[in-house]
Amino acid sequence: MRTLLIDNYDSFTYNLYQLLGEVNGVAPTVVRNDVDFDAIPLDEFDAVVVSPGPGRPAVEADFGVSARAILESGLPVLGVCLGHQGICHLFGGSVDLAPEPVHGRVFPVEHTGVDVFAGLPSPFKVVRYHSLVADSLPADLEPIAWTDGLVMGVRHRSKPIWGVQFHPESISSEFGRELLANFRDLALAHNARSGYQVHVRKVSALPDTEALFRDLYASGKHPFWLDSSSVIGGLSRFSFLGDGSGPLAEYLSYRLATGTVTVESATGTSTVESPFFEYLDSQLTQRAVPTPEGVPFDFNLGYIGYLGYELKAESGAQAVYQAEEPDAAMLFADRLIAVDHVAGETYLLALSLDGNDADALAWLAVTGNRVAGAPRAAGETGKSSRWLDMTSPEVRRVAAARHDHDGYLKRIKECFHEIDHGESYEVCLTNEISLDVRIDPLSTYTHLRRISPVPYGAFLDFPGVSVLCASPERFLSIGVDRVAEAKPIKGTRPRGATPVEDAALRADLLSNEKDQAENLMIVDLIRNDLNVVSEIGSVHVPKLFDVETYAPVHQLVSTIRGTLRPEQSPVACVRAAFPGGSMTGAPKLRTMEIIDRLEDGPRGVYSGAIGWFGLSGAVDLNIVIRTLVATASGVRFGVGGAIIALSDAEEEFAETAVKSRAMVTAVIDTALSSTGPSRTLLDAQDAA
């Protein structure tokens, strides 16, 4: 928290400075009380602390700009000693001589246990340094602490203003750190009040999410479906469905080439010149709102969409290629259906602004009734009756790779050269496959989710691009507790034809030195990325080399966690870790330069992230793998693997065929089974 500390020429100000810095994680900015108040950049601060000092608050030379800071800053304020007396004086109280001067003496203070005193014992010992005392309070101020009948603490009844007569920073005061931490939390909570309110309705029903999506959103504006088609304990439990038809919805698209965010809303279209991560961070800060009680997930509305791989240029990498689709696209969702696959319940969330609740409440009523009447979940997902890959005749007729077999092997050998010469430890080399077919994106996605259920699936139907994602990999999640978690995947085996073969493949993956080396390098890379923004000592690895099994493959997965430092936002954490290390290799920046040179083109959505940024401060993003991208120019997907010194070039190429199975099977099956003229994305847009 960024704090303005006004120094009233006191000898204890920098003791207060140190304690505030320890509590807030960032040092306060100190100004003397005789500076020009109008020159203070108040918009750069989250709170004001007014220090102790000599003299009287009614004397301008003694109190100076402290008075205007209390009355005009609009920020949360804590006054200490003279600062406390100033608050009492400015709001109409009287400050006179105390019954006796008290300096450097310890007294017990009793309190009501509210606000800055929350969670503190009553009484506790504090140090007093004062000859004056507030002996009467105005109606606007409420006494909340006393000693020997004298007021030791106040709060304003309607403004975020508090005062304490004693010195919490003194070496002999108890619970000074905790009192300042309470002020920090009060200030942050006040600043988070954005005028937005989240309304909730719970429906005791588990609808079929595909049927519900088709009924409510398939033909809507900017529909989205974050799809936990495979429910795994501790990983996936909720699916989120919605579109951009709400009154507060906004659609953001970003192009690195121009550095502009285009914002489309009900009031029109505007452009903002800003890096995307900075714009997103500022909007989330302005719109922050807590999650209502009883909601069992952290996504309380906010931004849903994708971050494309080329957005790496905002994380320190070079901008080399320009993708066909936007480099980032996010919908500000003000309406949402959340399906709880574990509890068998559904939650509806709607956002209102400045007390205009009628539209939100009406939507909850109408949509809740439709959810209650929707078909129930039928458990349709499961294994495909057949798997196709890049060697299948049906696929070979319509597929074209950016790099053919020989070209891909040549690039793998170049990776070996870079590794041998110390330029990289691991290069996550990928290929792009284009499919000359015509699909209906939603039909293809629903088939993909049936044959390859995953915890982090997604369907996005945005202007100019549809994204059909069957990702098993989490990039990064951040809870409201500010704990960040990454789950990189490195190491893949196909499923076996028999239980015995399947178990053998799983065991081989778990014990293979090459796969463990791949995984370990990315674990260490992500530990580094999280350490950039995390508390000292908080980054740890609760799971190393864990095998997770999905319909087409076994995967080797590790888990890394860290707790963000107070001054680091969730968006800053995402930016520090983006793109996910499992899609780059290490060292990250040098390896991305190698990737740009070898791959000869943009990755686009592939290798980026899909998910949400909540108004609660929470985040959940996947890694974009096993994903089809449909644009006006056709259908494509990326596929690749990590190249290390232990890699075998032919085996790496063969692994890309395994990883492509779900995508090509979904495309070929739906293209062949179309009952009418199939359509490209362009056809669908023209029809709309």
Task: Please state what every model-predicted region is.
Residues 2-6, 10-79, 91:
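Flexible gly/pro-rich beta->alpha loop and the following alpha-helix that scaffold active-site loops
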Residues 6-7, 166, 523:
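Active-site flanking residues adjacent to catalytic metal/cofactor-binding acidic residues
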Residues 36-39, 134-135, 331:
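Short loop/turn elements that flank and shape the SAM/SAH-binding pocket of Class I
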Residues 61-68, 145, 178-180, 443, ...:
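Charged helix-capping and loop-helix junction motifs
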Residues 64-80, 85-174:
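Pocket-forming structural segment of enzyme catalytic cores
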Residues 169-194:
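Acyltransferase
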Residues 193-688:
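Extended alpha-helical targeting/anchoring segments
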